[in-house]
Amino acid sequence: MIANLTGLFLSVLAASAVLPSVIADAKSAKLETTDTMIPSGEPGVELFVRNKHRAGKQAFSADKIVLFVHGATYPAETAFDLPIEGMSMMDLIASRGYDVYLVDVRGYGRSTRPAEMSQPPGANKPIVSTKVAAHDLGAAVDFILKKRHVSKINVMGWSWGTSIAGLYTSENNNRVNRLVLYAPQWIRTEPRAPAAANAPPLGAYRLVSKDSARERWLKGVPEDKKSDLIPPGIFDAWADATWATDPDSSKQNPPMLRAPNGVAEDNANYWTAGKALYDPTKISVPTLILQICQATWRRVILLS
């Protein structure tokens, strides 16, 4: 998955193809990494932002700055900067001369967890809607614009992140240089499954186990293809790093990752109800839409 995402992303930004020489160069590149907690613009809410770039380089043009936003369940840090065989996607892009950032919206990763996430899931209504997440993305964009003295940057969203980035861009074209929507959400045309008669109301957040994550990743994959989809050791490395970003995960047995349900509520109210959450005709910047051709990959991305 990391190699696939990286190759696609670099092509979007007109970088070189991912060849063995590029990989070797990336591994030898000296990179600077900075982790920052930035204000969201709302009292008590801070957002985790990571930045990587070649060591010693501080000046970047707008077309060389990239911000990545995660999907519905897992944080950007382990989606975008998990070292596999000594290198992450973020490392590779930074080694090619880009100023690369990731952001976790509130409720995810190292960003502030809303107070509702310290209560039982069913005690409150769904939290962290796409609109709220787009606000957080905007805070990260503004932070980068000020830091690098530029007027716009490139933005990439993955899965739910495409809705976050799409909504933000539709309202802030002047701050976005280019937009990448990888595995975007859109209006679902298949009939909606009827809700169970005794189904409880959607709570503030959901709990996700490592086993359930693995099962959903591999759902529908032929047995002889599973080892190719997730090479040995990769899932465990990703899961351990991902669950470690939730300070409460280890308090349960098995460990459970908390993920806000605002995205699930938006799915029900918009995408599966035949309505778009944002108006794509209001996006005027160059945009690349990347869709998965294999159904299984689509499941993996949409559940991310």
Residues of each region from the PLM?
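Glycine-rich "HGGG/HGxG" loop immediately N-terminal to the catalytic nucleophile
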Residues: 76-77, 103-125
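Conserved hydrolase catalytic core segment
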Residues: 151-190
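Alpha/beta-hydrolase active-site loop
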Residues: 121-147
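Alpha/beta-hydrolase
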Residues: 190-290
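N-terminal cap/lid segment of alpha/beta-hydrolase-fold proteins
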Residues: 27-61
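Short, surface-exposed "cap/lid" segments of acyl-processing enzymes
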Residues: 56-102
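Conserved alpha/beta-hydrolase "acid-adjacent" motif
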Residues: 295-302
